[in-house]
């Protein structure tokens, strides 16, 4: 049996033969960490089995019992509590988070992706999607049937929003509570494996969004078993996950084991770690270092490249600095600064955290494209303090930062979930896309962005607890009332119409102007593959210049240029060297350069070589 540090399940199949009568299946060892319990009972397929303490591991309980490795249902009863509790390391919750657990034999799935050698992050383009709203059906199988669209688009990695179980049928996924299992309405463990297998057959890698900083408010039974949470620290979700208090060794192993299971048992290629700035850890070896080392070890064992992407709002280079250089060892992180610069420059919005970026948006955009972050130790009015730290442009590869025009957060956390594409001129959308896809960072698209989807992506929930549902509903309306929104204008998260209205409309890409924008995205992705300058990792080699009053910006990638005019007047834009070729333009009527300058029409984009 593998050690727990490599992510073994609490339920593992032994190599013993079937019982003599052949009716009860092979012996399984059931393991449970419940350090505060005095007695633990395993209930397996209706039969009770007392568990014994593990003499070698304090707090652990063991039981060996015959079970069907892919069908048996089970749970645990602690002391005199009559409630049957699901396994914290359950691989399947067929009846949801509140029901019994079910064994899953990961070895039984027949993979067809044997030749798959993995997909590295450098040079790749990610596509973020939510299983429940990507298709009308909202399942893994339905999403797999749309993968050819992503192949034709030209992306490399599909990033799934969280898929762990949560109460109800639909939600964003960030209220998951069974961190080793898969949401049944999506298709359960088998459905996720079929999706990954289908993606790999098409040459697409898969990234999974995982949440370690909190669990959902309903269906979370971990505190019944042990000190999974601590009051030493507090987060926006309440008590912090216990990463540094007594008992934290086991909690950290629990989270690392969950992460490794996705990479090993489901053959996922990378993980996106939600809000790592909320992982409060005062220990000498940070949890992220431990996780990074474990993933690196698994990658060496499997022969596949595996990677970790963090969501961090710290603007701290340590997050993406290798462990051997004193960093936390993540391979990349999201860069909200680039999004905020683009959003402010394209829309003119200046509320809340857009304020600093809207003062001189094109200057800020040029700064961010060349330095990695806008706030790199500068004053941040939204926080009321200085924020961030400079990146070492000579040592930090640009692909360690993700750049994007839309994300689930930046769309869904708006009051009405309206996309930037719902009201913005397609020519401006095309300019924003060009700066992301020819820019220095690892690009990421949000589902439907490629055709300028007009459908919103709103905040939706399906909480089964009426009190919790009402608290979420009133809390969201109260939040946006502070920004001037009337309560009736904020969609009800619990309304089925909010969820259904957030699904993509797959007829849009066949109509104008959506079809033209989709063709532009395909052109940009093809250019990125064909011209190594656009994937050059040297951040120090990136140059950008902008004119705030005339509303133009030119991005230099070696001998390549991306020039955008965001204004309403034609502008003569300097290219810095005579142009030799036009590679792409939007709209197509943009004229050819005249030597080292280019007359750009209003709201237009030109990409070429000098």
Model features per residue range: what roles?
Residues 563-567:
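Asparagine-centered strand-capping/turn motif at beta-strand->loop junctions
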Residues 374-389, 445-446, 451-460, 482-560:
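Glycan-recognition and catalytic regions of carbohydrate-active enzymes
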Residues 33-39, 569, 577-579:
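Short proline/glycine-enriched turn/loop motifs at strand-loop junctions of beta-rich domains
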Residues 580, 586, 601-605:
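Tight coil/turn sites that cap or link beta-strands
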Residues 114-121, 130-301, 307, 319:
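Substrate-binding/active-site clefts of carbohydrate-active enzymes
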Residues 34, 70-71, 593-610:
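C-terminal beta-strand-rich structural cap/linker in extracellular carbohydrate-active enzymes
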